[in-house]
Amino acid sequence: MTRVAFLGLGRMGAPMAGRLSNAGHDLVVWSRTRTHAEALADRAEVAGSPAEAGSKADVAVTMLADGAALEEVVLGRDGLAGGLGSGSLLIDMSTTGPAPARKVAKALEERGVGFVDAPVAGSIGPASEGTLAIMVGGPDEAVERARPLLEVLGDPQRTWHVGPVGAGQAAKLMVNLVLGGVTVAVAEGYTLGRLLGLSPDDALDVLEGASVATQTVRSKRDMLRSGDYGHPGFRLALMHKDLRLAVDAARAARASLPGTERVAELYAGAKGRGLADQDYAAVAAYLASMAPLLEHTPPES
């Protein structure tokens, strides 16, 4: 089995690392919050730095917050790049946008280290079950080398090699752009239905059964009905970050996404009302706060 370094053991990274361990891979782990790494000490070696983790592995997997975190962990002081040997491979599964992926890939290429960007779609449940959707960018040889690990972490039928380095990030931004917009549409539709006198259950039954957003309604129904968004599958702050990455990527390509810019502003407003660490569907609570006849309003920050 492959000796794997896993860096970034947050809500998604921890169950993903656990799956690799359960599949029989030798694991060395590192996380900025050391207690997260120590929680896996019974089945993985805990490294003191990214460089140490990289020096003990053939393949490294990163699951980090954003592009800045990726660059710091890989290229910074005591970074992963200093530990990975020539011929090793980094699979970055964070959502960073294409530019950081390409920057890190170029720096690693100069050291003889391969790179694949493989951001995921899915929340904690799919991460634990190994059913994540994965969008992959990188050279054919590197992707094929990564594939056995990706098949442990995700659904092979929903793992797409979409192009060179950075293409996986482009695909992920596309997916979350649509998801963020659909969620706002569902939230506004639900708000309108309630304002016009529909009961919560009737409004949600119709939205789930008759709209193109059926999957979003089904997955968020209980949250919308109760107004409790405190057990996030995907945090609102991260959805906002991904939407901003999409807007920035379009601007870099000399294009604009006016609808997405407005959607991003709504998520920013929800963040400003103290909902950053709630599920991203809490944008519905922010919208409800603009409709004072409704009962669920977000807390003040």
Where do the protein language model's features map onto the residues?
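NAD(P)+-binding Rossmann beta1-loop-alpha1 motif at the extreme N-terminus of oxidoreductases
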Residues: 1-63, 88, 93-94, 158-159
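Amphipathic alpha-helical hairpins
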Residues: 11, 15, 59, 65, ...
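Hydrophobic beta-strand scaffold residues
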Residues: 27, 46, 115-116, 200, ...
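Rossmann-fold NAD(P) dinucleotide-binding segment
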Residues: 50-113
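Rossmann-fold dinucleotide-binding core
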Residues: 64, 95-177
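Helical "substrate-binding/catalytic lid" subdomain
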Residues: 167-287
